[in-house]
Amino acid sequence: MSSISMKELLEAGVHFGHQTKRWNPKMKPYIFGARNGIYIIDLQKTVRYFKSAYNFVKESVLNGDTVLFVGTKKQAQDSVCEEAQRCGMHYVNQRWLGGMLTNFTTVKQSIDRLKRIDAMFEDGTIEAYPKKEALQFEKERVKLQKILGGIKGMNRLPGLMFVIDPKNEEIAIQEAKKLGIPVVAIVDTNCDPDPIDYVIPGNDDAIRAIRLLSSKMADAVIEGAQARNAALQAEKEGAADAETAGEQVVEEEVAQA
């Protein structure tokens, strides 16, 4: 299991919250105190809640669920993309389209459109079109890729969602809650923790803090996926052994007859 240390959290600045005048009182249980007008997050609680979130993500992936990484603010975009790709999951790091989950059937049509245009460029079909029309296809492709590129391979709704800054991703969380999709999130002192199933109290603005916690969640996905693959392989080998044993019994019975 991937662990997280107080040293790592301190070095990444995970303990720095928002200004005391910009806070959500519901975050009081996760706050250690204030320093120079800034709330300091209780990192002992961050470690504790991180472990719960990590285990939940790992077990969910072990059971076959997929994870959607969401973080559209500038500080989160690179980490969300890189860590989701590293663990083989989907992501949204640009604009969240309203209905991306609740109206996934329609969004899927746009994804299929992107795939068709991609195929035209890959197999050379695009060359049969006039230059002006080909340019329009390219513009559409770039636009769709920017918004939908991270979920291009998502054929069904995710089993859970990992979010950076729930205050910024309010619509995404509302859609997840409506569909009963659990949410794991980095929750800063200005956020409402109530809609979040697995709160990770922490700085959701500093790039280093975001990268650290995102990478740990990606590690949880990888660990869960490895355990799932091992279990499936063992099941497959067990079935093969049982089949071989059955054949041997039949052969022995035939020989005795």
UniProtKB/Swiss-Prot annotation:
Record-linked InterPro entries: Ribosomal_uS2, Ribosomal_uS2_bac/mit/plastid, Ribosomal_uS2_CS, Ribosomal_uS2_flav_dom_sf
GO process annotations (BP): translation
Sorted UniProt keywords: Ribonucleoprotein, Ribosomal protein
CDD domains, per database record: RPS2
NCBIfam families: rpsB_bact (TIGR01011)
Family statement: Belongs to the universal ribosomal protein uS2 family.
The protein's name in its UniProt record: Small ribosomal subunit protein uS2
Organism, scientific name: Pelobacter propionicus (strain DSM 2379 / NBRC 103807 / OttBd1)
Gene name for this UniProt entry: rpsB
